[in-house]
């Protein structure tokens, strides 16, 4: 296919003068961006029909013929883009010439370089909605002070009154002259002479908007936006709404069948969404983002001052907008609910590329290999049978195979997206062998759990959500959210019980000190009840781990079979916690001891001492992965359904104790040394013993500090204690001072600088979107992105991996 160069730079036809791109986009809106000529785009006839319905105030009737051969989205080559403005109303619109790609062109590995010039967005401008006094014949136009100082040339305040003449050009290159004066009580900026002429010529009324722009050459431009008003009288020469719907559908269907060119007109102020978008934007949204019901998201909206604002919402459903005419369409396939009370002004349905889900996938192309948070089923691949059909993205989006969910396969050719997907999918993470072993171990462990023991029941509650997740599809995410809440509640109850029991045994400190001075054999006998209590508390987890280690041919301590089958080994509570029997958990063991010999003699924790030291800090590669069982499997951060970060095993506030000589060191937990059971049990046993044995005081100042690394291209990474701040504003100010970029981080939309952070799950998120407490608890390190870094991330994706450190130091 030969590319047309007549549209490069948005040139007009037949000598028509090219419109100013900045002014056109200012009138169109801050969220509108035309694709470049020569690029590949996706055309949605369903969205085009929506525009026709909006302009004619009439929805599509049922008797309009359907075109089964017309797919819900067409991959096209954009040959020409021309910007226009209506002579009578100054309404801006764009004319696009599209040509559908052939099946062979859709399968091309490399996308042709875009030859067009990117759309130029305005930088210095202001927009004001006119009031009744602004449109009166005897008044003037009141300009906000900050807007006048930002856009208009500076006034000479030595004059009385300060005044000057302004010359501005509109979309049709017509000059308008105004007298700019600073007067009144209180004094304000006004446009007087020439303003009433402009209002009359443009037929402006209260509610319309006026836009002033100053370009790089300090030239002024002037544009208008008419408020939406209902059409009462339609000229007879105008085509009916039904005729327009039939015409656009017939033209698109013919072009799709013959691969011929067709023309569409895009009216940005009439259309609620763009129905011609860049192919790269579509691929990123549909194939590189996975959403589910209940997920949080953000979306940009235009304000009255022609700026943008983010609104937050929740995904409430995923389905076709019109399953009869447009099955398997991505157009407005996401049902949403908005947070704020003004949600009535926003659409209840949006398209996937319009939102930014607050999930594991970043808003920019991923800089790291794609890691799946949970094991995938064999039927959830986004590329079934190695093909890249457009419908496969929607099948993946809905959490299962198309046939299982009642979705019909699409009947139009594939679009050749497979080469791009190869760069993003890590197929090594999509095997099912590990998933089957994981599910089998969970099922075996759950069958060996007694039903009458409260402590074990709490562990069952922690295991069941993850076990059930492997048997359910993504459509049951709402149930999983409820189960996660129950899991967190069970964890809090267990931690509260452990803390209470520890505090009840603090009076036994003197006895513990005497025990530490006795021979090792006597210490082992006295500590046996405590050790047995902790061992039984985690016996279920050790049993699961033993099975897993045997399958993976890794060494593990030998446990007797009776550990899991002997019904006599049960917990029994004693009468009083103050009995002084030395049993930490106040349990009596009625059966035989199941404590292996090596657990009483080996361990990685420091030896006993009488002095407190800094808080316990487990060695870890990076946060959230401290108890990884499979070093080669990055999607296994939990211990058989129990999240190590939840604080179930060891709360982060438990202190550790070091000997006064400073020779006690902690070695990493390893499965190849004495086994994970030794490390976990020794950590619990020694740390609890030291808590009861020590006589010092905890240094509380070390507990409250939360140091993170901050990186910036061209600068050395620095550490920052974010616990000193209480808001994002304070953090931005401190980062600006730290790297000598004051004022650039407070307004990212204007400066182009962005602050992003990587959380404990190694995901890149935009700083400022989450509540402050959630950010403090989940941040791993912070990255300051210059405008060049942001552009590099957007253009090169994974090729920009140098922007982020691969192994940053975590404090």
Swiss-Prot record:
Source organism per UniProt: Arabidopsis thaliana (Mouse-ear cress)
Pfam name, any one: B3
Highest classification ranks of the organism: Eukaryota, Viridiplantae, Streptophyta, Embryophyta, Tracheophyta
Molecular function in Gene Ontology: DNA-binding transcription factor activity; transcription cis-regulatory region binding
Protein family membership: Belongs to the ARF family.
Gene that produces this protein: ARF8
Listed SMART domains: B3
Protein name per Swiss-Prot or TrEMBL: Auxin response factor 8
Compositionally biased spans, kind Polar residues: 469-482, 544-555
Region of interest (Disordered), residue spans: 467-496, 544-565
Gene Ontology biological-process annotations: auxin-activated signaling pathway; flower development; fruit development; response to auxin
CDD domains tied to this protein: B3_DNA (cd10017)
Record's note on what induces expression: Repressed by miR167.
Primary localization class, coarse: nucleus
Subcellular location: Nucleus
Record feature DNA-binding region, as residue ranges: 126-228
